[in-house]
């Protein structure tokens, strides 16, 4: 019997209050790592009407004007006017930063393996910056090997920003959210059930001021200039049965930090797989790569994507866990949900053989401390909105599939042995 079900994921635009915070946090991280690649950073940001608070823990030799960084990022997002209750030049920016705890630093600077003289390997030098669990996922539903609901939600959110920035829909404002519901049959996406877009906008569009007429115009414009371009290169398409909802409250004029307070790290499902995969709970933005919440989650995605790209599974989830101050993972798990072409235990052995999963190894393999400097001071802030994974618009080291051929060949050899 065919099993039919619906699955939904959401995304948000760069002007969403929580995403403003994520982007400021990662802009700070980019600047500090550009000047001092060994910086230890945990930058948290809060925004509200007229206020930006930058807090957390930072240990660095870099000398950077964080207030200017925050204002420039806010202006880049699009909050430049004074009529929104939140603007780059009229908000108050407060800074309350401490240094990284020496109790934490000693475990990161020298991992337990070297403190106890149990290993002199180079990658055993740095301990994990915290305990925790991290997940990575890949599947063959979308070209970028991501689940289709989050892939489409991100595409819609990015296109919302495109038509705002280029002036096609100049009445749009920065805040917005998207949501896509996909119908599945026996685990395969078969239809677009619902598309939801909530976008901040001016109260009037030209000479149109009636609320209902404004919403009708927005809905028509979004279908033509946001939805249709997003689906132009996809096999799956919205049809006559697809519900299209736009600003269901009836209007969305008050938005951004004037409408809701924002906080770094509050959109972790948007940042990852849209709820399609499990999540360890750790946020990414504002954290330097010694924090395994970030670097190990990138490594998990890298492993899972290479397994799927190799054709060894249709779906793959990888879990890592760490102990603070210890270099080697406490556990590694590979799960293919019955779609694997070889046993999960075989894949696990291949992962242990071909992927470096100690923090120092992950940092070196992905060049995570130096990429901001090599890319003109802009690296982490580029993934702080519209997802950290499946970003074909960016050159991200954890999205490479350079190990797929090796995995495929060695997995095939095990089946022939």
UniProtKB/Swiss-Prot annotation:
Residue segments, region Flexible loop: 100-110
Cited Gene3D superfamilies: 3.30.300.10
GO MF annotations in UniProt: ATP binding; magnesium ion binding; methionine adenosyltransferase activity
TM ranges: none
Cofactor(s) required, per the database record: Mg(2+); K(+)
Record's subcellular location: Cytoplasm
Binding-site residues for Mg(2+), renumbered to this chain: 18
First-level EC class: transferase
Single Gene Ontology BP annotation: one-carbon metabolic process
Superkingdom to which the source organism belongs: Bacteria
Binding residues annotated for ATP, in chain numbering: 16, 175-177, 251-252, 260, 266-267, 283, 287
UniProt-listed Enzyme Commission number(s): 2.5.1.6
GO-annotated cellular components: cytoplasm
Binding-site residues, L-methionine: 57, 100, 260, 291
Residues the entry annotates as binding K(+): 44
PANTHER family registered for this protein in UniProt: S-ADENOSYLMETHIONINE SYNTHETASE
Protein family (similarity comment): Belongs to the AdoMet synthase family.
Assembly, per entry: Homotetramer; dimer of dimers.
Function as written in the Swiss-Prot or TrEMBL entry: Catalyzes the formation of S-adenosylmethionine (AdoMet) from methionine and ATP. The overall synthetic reaction is composed of two sequential steps, AdoMet formation and the subsequent tripolyphosphate hydrolysis which occurs prior to release of AdoMet from the enzyme.
Listed name of the protein: S-adenosylmethionine synthase
Natural source organism: Synechococcus elongatus (strain ATCC 33912 / PCC 7942 / FACHB-805)
Gene label: metK
């Amino acid at each position: 019997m065919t099993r039919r079900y619906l699955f939904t994921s959401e995304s948000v635009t760069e002007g969403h209050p929580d995403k403003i915070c994520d982007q400021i946090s990662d802009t700070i991280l980019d600047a500090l790592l550009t000047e001092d690649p060994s910086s230890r950073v945990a930058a948290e940001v809060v925004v509200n009407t007229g206020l930006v608070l930058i807090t957390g823990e930072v240990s660095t030799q870099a000398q950077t004007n964080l207030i200017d960084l925050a204002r420039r990022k806010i202006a880049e997002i699009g909050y430049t006017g004074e009529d929104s209750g939140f603007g780059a030049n009229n908000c108050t920016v407060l800074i309350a930063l401490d240094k990284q705890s020496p109790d934490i630093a000693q475990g990161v600077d020298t991992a337990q393996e070297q403190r106890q003289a149990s290993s002199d390997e180079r990658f055993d030098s740095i301990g994990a910056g915290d305990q925790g669990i991290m997940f990575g996922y890949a599947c063959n539903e979308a070209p970028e090997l991501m689940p289709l609901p989050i892939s489409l939600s991100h595409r819609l959110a990015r296109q919302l920003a495109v038509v705002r920035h280029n002036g096609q829909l100049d009445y749009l404002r920065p805040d917005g959210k998207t949501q896509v519901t996909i119908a599945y049959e026996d685990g395969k996406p078969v239809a677009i059930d619902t598309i939801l877009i909530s976008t901040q906008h001016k109260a009037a569009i030209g000479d149109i001021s009636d609320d209902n007429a404004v919403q009708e115009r927005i809905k028509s414009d979004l279908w033509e200039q946001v939805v249709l371009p997003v689906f132009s290169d996809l096999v799956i398409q919205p049809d006559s049965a697809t519900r299209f909802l736009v600003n269901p409250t009836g209007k969305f004029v008050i938005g951004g930090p004037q409408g809701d307070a924002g906080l770094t790290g509050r959109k972790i499902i948007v940042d990852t797989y849209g709820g399609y995969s499990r999540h360890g709970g750790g946020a990414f933005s504002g954290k330097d790569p010694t924090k395994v919440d970030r670097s190990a989650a990138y490594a998990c995605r890298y492993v899972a994507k290479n397994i799927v790209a190799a054709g060894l599974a249709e779906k793959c989830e990888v879990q890592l866990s760490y102990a603070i101050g210890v270099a080697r993972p406490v556990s590694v798990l590979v799960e293919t949900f019955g779609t694997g072409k070889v046993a999960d235990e075989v894949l696990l052995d291949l992962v242990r053989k071909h992927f470096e999963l100690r923090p120092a190894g992950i940092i070196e393999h992905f060049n995570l401390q130096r990429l901001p400097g090599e890319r003109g001071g802009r690296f982490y802030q580029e993934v702080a909105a519209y997802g950290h994974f499946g970003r074909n618009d960016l050159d991200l080291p954890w999205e490479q599939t350079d190990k797929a051929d090796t995995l495929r060949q060695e997995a095939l050899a095990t089946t022939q042995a």
